């Protein structure tokens, strides 16, 4: 506040009148942002008046504070009202601009578009069907036994906690919304004759945030093969063929040791993406490994006779780096304009 400016009713009222006039003149949200900065931000007349209260004698501070505070409140209320009015006007203008006359006869039929996640899941399934695998399905509402116990999850494993898993009432039913598609693999081992080569895709549910890189409901693709004599070499060869078919020539995988309850040994699956939008690089994609003998025993299979490998990865994540999708929320919000850019092929 300058030394020549005093906190008087007239100086405060002048600052308020200037702010109100600017607010009234603002024609859109961008103009209102400028007004808000000029009349309420640090360095504005009202802000200078408010800062000047500190230099007043003690017997004047209360009255001056009440005067300036009331003025700032009037300006804030006017800004809020103007902001609401502009937002309503802009929304109304958008509705008019995007209005569709449902009685008008179209000149031609518009080509439809399927959701790219559905297309990508079918593309993945086609790759494995071409290798002689079969597609498997399973329920989204799953028992704890299939989702955790039979897959070698300890009773105190963090994934069983309510902050990670959606449990379904009543509690004594021991039902959960499946947290991965691995139960489909177990059901295939229990219900099909050996050898088993199955690929499964579907929705899974976790208590994740809804943001650019996380969804509480997303899709996974998992595969399992159980036969006599299978090794990590078979797993590696299968994954190399898969990624080269899906991502193009030059794509390959890298396996890094890790731990998963249902595989032993286990590995993180990295993908070398040769056509990544930001330049070729390694990208962490999923997990894999040899099926844990305890899982085979849960399905009544002798691990001394049979061995198997399994792998899993997120479909949304694959779509993001395969097709340069920046925000995972675009896949979940149902805006047809997102799907239309893909058409019928991904």
UniProtKB/Swiss-Prot annotation:
<dbReference type="GO" id="GO:0006432">
    <property type="term" value="P:phenylalanyl-tRNA aminoacylation"/>
</dbReference>
<comment type="subunit">
    <text>Tetramer of two alpha and two beta subunits.</text>
</comment>
<dbReference type="GO" id="GO:0005524">
    <property type="term" value="F:ATP binding"/>
</dbReference>
<keyword id="KW-0648">Protein biosynthesis</keyword>
<dbReference type="Pfam" id="PF01409">
    <property type="entry name" value="tRNA-synt_2d"/>
</dbReference>
<feature type="binding site">
    <location>
        <position position="264"/>
    </location>
    <ligand>
        <name>Mg(2+)</name>
    </ligand>
</feature>
<keyword id="KW-0067">ATP-binding</keyword>
<dbReference type="InterPro" id="IPR004188">
    <property type="entry name" value="Phe-tRNA_ligase_II_N"/>
</dbReference>
<keyword id="KW-0963">Cytoplasm</keyword>
<keyword id="KW-0030">Aminoacyl-tRNA synthetase</keyword>
<dbReference type="GO" id="GO:0004826">
    <property type="term" value="F:phenylalanine-tRNA ligase activity"/>
</dbReference>
<dbReference type="InterPro" id="IPR045864">
    <property type="entry name" value="aa-tRNA-synth_II/BPL/LPL"/>
</dbReference>
<dbReference type="InterPro" id="IPR004529">
    <property type="entry name" value="Phe-tRNA-synth_IIc_asu"/>
</dbReference>
<keyword id="KW-0436">Ligase</keyword>
<keyword id="KW-0460">Magnesium</keyword>
<dbReference type="Pfam" id="PF02912">
    <property type="entry name" value="Phe_tRNA-synt_N"/>
</dbReference>
<dbReference type="InterPro" id="IPR002319">
    <property type="entry name" value="Phenylalanyl-tRNA_Synthase"/>
</dbReference>
<dbReference type="InterPro" id="IPR010978">
    <property type="entry name" value="tRNA-bd_arm"/>
</dbReference>
<dbReference type="InterPro" id="IPR022911">
    <property type="entry name" value="Phe_tRNA_ligase_alpha1_bac"/>
</dbReference>
<dbReference type="GO" id="GO:0000049">
    <property type="term" value="F:tRNA binding"/>
</dbReference>
<dbReference type="InterPro" id="IPR006195">
    <property type="entry name" value="aa-tRNA-synth_II"/>
</dbReference>
<dbReference type="GO" id="GO:0000287">
    <property type="term" value="F:magnesium ion binding"/>
</dbReference>
<keyword id="KW-0547">Nucleotide-binding</keyword>
<comment type="similarity">
    <text>Belongs to the class-II aminoacyl-tRNA synthetase family. Phe-tRNA synthetase alpha subunit type 1 subfamily.</text>
</comment>
<dbReference type="GO" id="GO:0005737">
    <property type="term" value="C:cytoplasm"/>
</dbReference>
<keyword id="KW-0479">Metal-binding</keyword>
<protein>
    <recommendedName>
        <fullName>Phenylalanine--tRNA ligase alpha subunit</fullName>
        <ecNumber>6.1.1.20</ecNumber>
    </recommendedName>
</protein>
């Amino acid at each position: 506040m300058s030394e020549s400016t005093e906190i008087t009713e007239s100086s405060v009222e002048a600052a308020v009148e200037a702010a109100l006039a600017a607010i009234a003149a603002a024609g859109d949200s961008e103009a209102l942002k400028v007004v808000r900065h000029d009349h309420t931000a640090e360095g504005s007349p009202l802000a200078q008046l408010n800062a000047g209260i500190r230099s007043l004698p003690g017997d004047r501070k209360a009255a001056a504070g009440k005067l300036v505070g009331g003025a700032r409140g009037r300006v804030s209320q006017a800004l809020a009202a103007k902001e609401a009015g502009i937002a309503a006007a802009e929304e109304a203008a958008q509705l008019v601009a995007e209005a569709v006359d449902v009685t008008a006869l179209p000149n031609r039929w518009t080509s439809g578009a399927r959701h790219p996640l559905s297309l990508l899941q079918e593309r993945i399934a086609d790759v494995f069907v071409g290798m002689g695998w079969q597609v498997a399905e399973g329920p989204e509402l799953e028992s704890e036994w299939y989702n955790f116990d039979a897959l070698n999850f300890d009773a105190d494993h963090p994934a069983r906690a309510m902050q990670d898993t959606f449990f379904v009432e009543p509690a004594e039913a021991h039902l959960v919304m499946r947290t991965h598609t691995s139960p489909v693999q177990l059901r295939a081992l229990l219900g099909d004759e050996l050898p088993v080569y199955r690929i499964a895709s579907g929705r899974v549910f976790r208590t994740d945030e809804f943001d650019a890189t996380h969804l509480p409901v997303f899709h996974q693709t998992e595969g399992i093969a159980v036969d006599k004599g299978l090794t990590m070499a078979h797993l590696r060869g299968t994954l190399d063929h898969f990624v080269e078919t899906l991502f193009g020539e030059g794509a390959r995988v890298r396996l890094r040791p890790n731990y998963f309850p249902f595989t032993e040994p286990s590995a993180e699956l990295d993908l070398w993406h040769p056509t990544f939008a930001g330049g070729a690089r390694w990208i962490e994609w999923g997990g894999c490994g040899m099926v844990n003998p305890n899982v085979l025993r849960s399905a009544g299979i002798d691990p001394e006779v049979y061995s198997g490998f399994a792998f899993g990865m997120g479909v949304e994540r694959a779509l993001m780096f395969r097709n340069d999708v920046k925000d995972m929320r675009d896949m979940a919000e149902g805006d047809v304009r997102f799907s239309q850019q893909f058409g019928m092929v991904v």
